[in-house]
């Protein structure tokens, strides 16, 4: 079989960076964020969060090839707002939202278990 070993889809090799940032020379005020060992799950949620920011003009992602375990997120912002700042803010907001979701989920489980007993 030509498929790579399953562990290659999530394990970073020695010297491999999780995220690399490259300036997009085709478009003003834009960057390409390459995230290794991730797929559509993270790409779509980050893109959606970036698009909630009014200073983000464009946000999109692609998976270069199904056997390559990485996503490339392209972000273009207004001139007074850097793509790196937009990306950092989106990640911070997502962490907050997911922490709140986890807290509510755990509370609902606890309430349900107390109701059963």
From Swiss-Prot:
Example of a GO MF term:
DNA binding
* InterPro entries referenced in this protein's UniProt entry, alphabetically: RBP11, RBP11-like, RBP11-like_dimer, RNA_pol_Rpb11_13-16kDa_CS, Rpo11-like
Q: What is its main location?
A: nucleus
Q: Which family does it belong to?
A: Belongs to the archaeal Rpo11/eukaryotic RPB11/RPC19 RNA polymerase subunit family.
Source domain of life is Eukaryota
Name of this protein: DNA-directed RNA polymerase II subunit RPB11
Residue numbers bearing the N-acetylmethionine modification: 1
Q: Where in the cell is it found?
A: Nucleus
Lineage of the source organism? Answer: Eukaryota, Metazoa, Chordata, Craniata, Vertebrata
Instruction: Tell whether Transcription is among the UniProt keywords.
Output: yes
- UniProt keyword terms in alphabetical order: Acetylation, DNA-directed RNA polymerase, Nucleus, Transcription
Q: According to its UniProt entry, what is the function of this protein?
A: Core component of RNA polymerase II (Pol II), a DNA-dependent RNA polymerase which synthesizes mRNA precursors and many functional non-coding RNAs using the four ribonucleoside triphosphates as substrates.
- Is Acetylation a UniProt keyword of this protein? yes
GO CC, alphabetical: nucleoplasm; nucleus; RNA polymerase II, core complex
GO BP of this protein: transcription by RNA polymerase II
What organism is the protein native to? Mus musculus
Subunit field text: Component of the RNA polymerase II (Pol II) core complex consisting of 12 subunits: a ten-subunit catalytic core composed of POLR2A/RPB1, POLR2B/RPB2, POLR2C/RPB3, POLR2I/RPB9, POLR2J/RPB11, POLR2E/RPABC1, POLR2F/RPABC2, POLR2H/RPABC3, POLR2K/RPABC4 and POLR2L/RPABC5 and a mobile stalk composed of two subunits POLR2D/RPB4 and POLR2G/RPB7, protruding from the core and functioning primarily in transcription initiation. Part of Pol II(G) complex, in which Pol II core associates with an additional subunit POLR2M; unlike conventional Pol II, Pol II(G) functions as a transcriptional repressor.
* Pfam families in the record: RNA_pol_L_2 (PF13656)
């Amino acid at each position: 079989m030509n498929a790579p070993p399953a562990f290659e889809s999530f394990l970073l090799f020695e010297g491999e960076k999780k995220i690399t940032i490259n300036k997009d020379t085709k478009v003003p005020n834009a960057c390409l964020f390459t995230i290794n060992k991730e797929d559509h799950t993270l790409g779509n949620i980050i893109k959606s969060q970036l698009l909630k920011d009014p200073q983000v003009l464009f946000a999109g992602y692609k998976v270069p090839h199904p056997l390559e375990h990485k996503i490339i997120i392209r972000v273009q912002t207004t001139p007074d707002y850097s793509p790196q700042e937009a990306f950092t803010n989106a990640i911070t907001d997502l962490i907050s939202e997911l922490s709140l979701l986890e807290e509510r989920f755990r509370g609902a489980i606890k309430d349900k278990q107390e109701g059963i007993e």
